[in-house]
Every structure is written in C-alpha cells, then in structure tokens.
From Swiss-Prot:
A cellular component annotation (GO) from this entry: peptidoglycan-based cell wall
Reaction catalysis annotation: ATP + (deoxyribonucleotide)n-3'-hydroxyl + 5'-phospho-(deoxyribonucleotide)m = (deoxyribonucleotide)n+m + AMP + diphosphate
Enzyme active site: K211
UniProt note: phenotype after gene disruption: Not essential for growth.
Entry-linked InterPro entries: ATP-dep_DNA_ligase, DNA_ligae_ATP-dep_bac/arc, DNA_ligase_ATP-dep, DNA_ligase_ATP-dep_C, DNA_ligase_ATP-dep_cent, DNA_ligase_ATP-dep_CS, DNA_ligase_ATP-dep_N, DNA_ligase_N_sf
Annotated region (Not required for adenylyltransferase activity, required for nick joining), positions in chain: 1-172
Subunit relationships: Monomer.
Functional note: DNA ligase that seals nicks in double-stranded DNA during DNA replication, DNA recombination and DNA repair.
Organism, scientific name: Mycobacterium tuberculosis (strain ATCC 25618 / H37Rv)
Protein name: DNA ligase B
Keyword check for Lipid biosynthesis: no
Length: 507
C-alpha cells in the first residue's frame, strides 16, 4: 500500500465533522490493508497520531526546511516505516547529519499531500479528529467485531494497533488479558466543578484522595523483576530506581499497581512539576539526579496481586487490598465521606500541603483501563489570566479555513510590549472560531495567507490554565500549562491585561 492512500484518507477524515464518515473512511482503508498485520499496525498507529517506534529523535527543527515535493506518489507504507525505524536507531549526537539526510531523502520522495501528512505526524500535530473511540470503532467495523470487544482488547493490551492487527487477521481478541509485565491503558478522570458536584455525581458518598502533581506511573512486578511505565506506556524502569526499590520492598510476588512518582522538598511539600519531569529524560545521569532530586512513589490503586486480577473489583475492594500491602508512607491521603463540609476541608488541607487538588472515586467503580470514566472525578482550582493575542495560526481538520491556534502574550510594564507565554486552540466553539477569524483579519499585520498571521496586540482573551512551567521556548522563560480559552474580553483594553509578573506569580 502506498503512503498516498494513508495521506488521502487522513485528509478526508480531517475534512469531515461526521463521526460516521470518519469511521467509514478509516475502516475502508484498514479493510484494504488486512490481513497484513504489519501494515495494519502501522496504519492504525499513524492515524492515531503516533509512530510504532514511538520516538525517533526528529523534531520541528529538522522539519523546517523541506525539499520540493515529488510529482507522483511512490513511497510505500512499509518503506516509510522502515526509514523511520532507521532514523530512530541512529546513535548519539554525531548522527544528526545522517538523520537530517534521511529526513530530506524521505521528504523529497513524498508528494505535497504526503509531505503534509508526514510533517504533522512527525510534529505530533495530525489533528484530524480521529483518535480514541473513532479509531476503535473503525477497527471494529473493518474487522466485523463488536466495538466493546476491540476497546477491551486495546485497553488490556495497552495498544489499539496490536488489537487491530489481531482482529483484522482473524485472531481471537479474548487472548488480550491483564498480564504482569505488559502495560495497560491507565484509567482517566473526568472533571467535577467542586467537591459538592463530585458527591452528587457519585450518589452522595465518595472517596476523596490527594491529587499529586507528579508523574503517573504503572508498576509491574513479577517475582524480583520490576518494570515501570509512564502514562503513555513508555518503559522508564532504569530512570526510577527509587520506585523499583519501593516496589521490591513490598510483601508480594506478582503485582500491577497504579501510582505517582514525585519529587518532594525536605519538608515533604511537592517540588515543582518540572523537577519531577526532569527525572524522566532519556539522557539523565540517574545516579547524579537521584542524589540531588530524589523521587518518592505513592501507590493509589492495585490491579493485580499474586494471581488475582482486580480490574473488575469495586474501588473499595481494590483500596482494601492496597492498604493491606502498601505502608502508609507510600499511599496518598484519603477521605471517605458524604459530608460536603468535610470534603471541602479535605480539599483545602490538600491544597495547603502544596498539592494540585483532589480525586473523587466512586466506591463501587471498576477500573476502566484506558478510558475516561465518571467513576473518577478530579477537582482542582482553575487559574485564569487575561492575555493579549499576538498572532494566530490557520487551523486544520474541522478548523480548516479558520484562524485557530492563538499566540498568547502577557503585558511587560518595563517595555510597554508583550511577552509570549504560550499557544492554544482549546476551548474554542464553532461560533468563536467564526468570530475570531473575522476579527483577526481586521487586526492582521501584513499578509494573512501564511501559516502564522501576525496581529496588532489589541484583542484581550481570558484563558484558564492549570499552572505555569519553565520553558526555553518563549522569551519570558515561562509557559502556560493546559491553557484553554474561556472568552474574549471586548470590555478590556490591552493595557489592562495581566502582566508577566502575574504569570510568574503562578509559577
């Protein structure tokens, strides 16, 4: 199969807002690829916005200057995958020239449509509105299987591509079960507006836990062998010896547990998230980092213990098993209550301890691997800032033809200008996209046909964010975390926008 077929399907999927049409287009492509398991695996990975190789060391810097496109499609899917694998296996810093040469060779053989697809795939910005459930439904349709069967296999196998390859080759998907040493998709939480909202949605009584601002880890132990996986299922065992040691100290033979790794200050308050995140880098000197930035691990769920699977067990049963195994110093603070006042006090105490909020877990909820269920609800304060839009990018997918991704700036009183602190297209409704496309044409500086449109700094926007982190990407040295648009502020002048000092105060 040609890369052209995948690129055109991706374009078609991005161009429609119909879920049924997206599913049908992807299913048709997968049906053509079956029963070739390698081909199916690659296509499902790519159309999910991922690479089978996961990381190949190619970022935006290597994709800035592309050769002219090829006139006719000739690249095959498996050939491109082999090239990406070769790029990813080049060793050391001295391989940058070789990597750049291979990237240039690949793109020179790609048509314009193929270049666009590869550029977005490698840049992590496929944006075709076909992740998660849509991809699973497409696999199910192509394989003639119930969607629930495909979803469960993907959750327990930790990989939709593997489940797709099995299903489309005629293999039984009931072989995908929880297996120690094979990571599964983590359960994710929906959002509650308050502890009172969480109590109501969980029937009046729920289990509140401290929500730590660390790094999610999935811990597997088989006898004296421990493997640690991230939320994205990357193996980081070698980087987290503290987690390995804490796991080996538990009186258990086989274990699958869910937890959080976090760097703490001497007074046990959490370090900034980036301190924890720095321990997960591929080039980190683990021994040196451990000496200066040690990690602690907190277990908050247990999915398997010594031959017994607990995925179908209610939260209360899983937590009882956890408490019987893990000492209190390695568990998160917890409160079971039906009293909104007690819940609010627990949230306040958790925030005062430096944590980011609380999780509410329904007592009877099962562990929904790889799914965002109402059985878990996160409650945390939301920060907002009034910032100025400095530039905007043309959208893709359902946002094609709209000015979408906005560049956000904070006011700098020292210079009278604005300092860029992030970008976002989150939170925008269709009506908002229509409005801002018209508005930004009115305040554009220079041409509007390029990918990025520069603007006069006149439009104030209110954004919600989860916090601020250090970043070398922006001039102010800071970047917003999970910024999303709340509303545009026609009532505010740019001189009333929040300052860069206000942004720093959230760090």
């Amino acid at each position: 199969m040609l890369l052209h077929d995948v690129a055109i399907t991706s374009m078609d999927v991005a161009a429609t807002s119909s879920r049924l049409t997206k599913v049908a287009r992807i299913a048709a492509l997968l049906h053509r690829a079956a029963p070739d398991t390698q081909l199916v695996t690659i296509i499902v990975s790519w159309l999910s916005g991922e690479l089978p190789q996961r990381h190949i060391g190619v970022g935006w810097a290597a994709l800035r200057s592309l050769p002219p496109p090829a006139p006719q499609p000739a690249l095959t899917v498996t050939g491109v995958d082999a090239t990406l694998s070769k790029i990813g296996t080049l060793p050391g810093k001295g391989s940058q020239a070789q990597r750049a040469a291979l990237v240039a060779e690949l793109f020179s053989a790609a048509t314009e449509a193929e270049q666009t697809f590869l550029l977005r795939l490698l840049g992590g910005e496929l944006r075709q509105g076909a992740k998660g459930g849509i991809m699973a439904d497409a696999v199910a349709q192509a394989a003639g299987l119930p969607a629930a069967t495909v979803q469960r296999a993907a959750m327990l196998g930790g990989d939709l591509a593997a489940a797709a390859a099995a299903g489309l080759s005629g293999a039984a998907l009931d072989t995908f079960t929880l297996r120690v040493g094979r990571p599964i998709g983590p359960m994710l939480a929906q959002t509650a507006t308050s502890v009172h909202d969480a109590l109501e949605r969980h029937g009046g009584t729920t289990i509140f836990e401290a929500k730590l601002d660390g790094a999610r880890v999935q811990i597997h132990r088989a006898n004296d062998q421990v493997r640690i996986y991230t939320r994205s299922l990357d193996d980081v065992t070698a980087r987290l010896p503290e987690v390995v040691e804490a796991t080996l100290a538990l009186p258990v033979r086989d274990l699958v547990a869910d937890g959080e790794a976090i760097a703490l200050c001497p007074d046990n308050r959490p370090q900034r998230f980036q301190v924890t995140a720095s321990r997960f880098g591929r080039s980190v000197d683990v021994a040196a980092a451990r000496a200066t930035q040690p990690l602690s691990v907190f277990f908050f769920d247990i999915l398997h213990r010594d031959g017994t699977d607990l995925l179908e067990a209610p939260t209360t049963e899983r937590l009882a098993a956890l408490d019987a195994l893990v000492p209190a110093r390695h568990r998160v603070d917890r409160l079971i209550t039906s009293d909104p006042t007690d819940a609010a006090n627990f949230l306040d105490a958790t925030l005062a301890a430096g944590h980011e909020g609380v999780m509410a877990k329904a007592p009877a909820a099962r562990y929904l691997a790889g799914r965002r269920g109402a059985g878990w609800l996160k409650v945390k304060p939301v920060h907002t800032l009034d910032l100025v839009v400095l530039a905007v990018e043309w959208g893709s997918g359902r946002r094609r033809g709209k000015l979408s991704n906005i560049h956000l700036g904070a006011r700098d009183p020292a210079t009278g200008g604005f300092v860029m602190v992030g970008k976002t297209f989150k939170g925008m409704t269709d009506a908002m996209l229509d409005w801002q496309t018209t508005r930004f044409h009115e305040i554009a500086v220079g041409p509007t046909d390029g990918y990025v449109v520069q603007l006069r700094p006149e439009q104030v926007v209110e954004v919600a964010l989860d916090g601020v982190q250090r970043s070398s990407r922006y001039p102010g040295g800071l970047a917003l975390r999970f910024a999303r648009v709340v509303r545009y502020r026609a009532d505010k002048d740019p001189a009333e926008a929040d300052t860069i000092d206000a942004v720093r105060a959230l760090y």
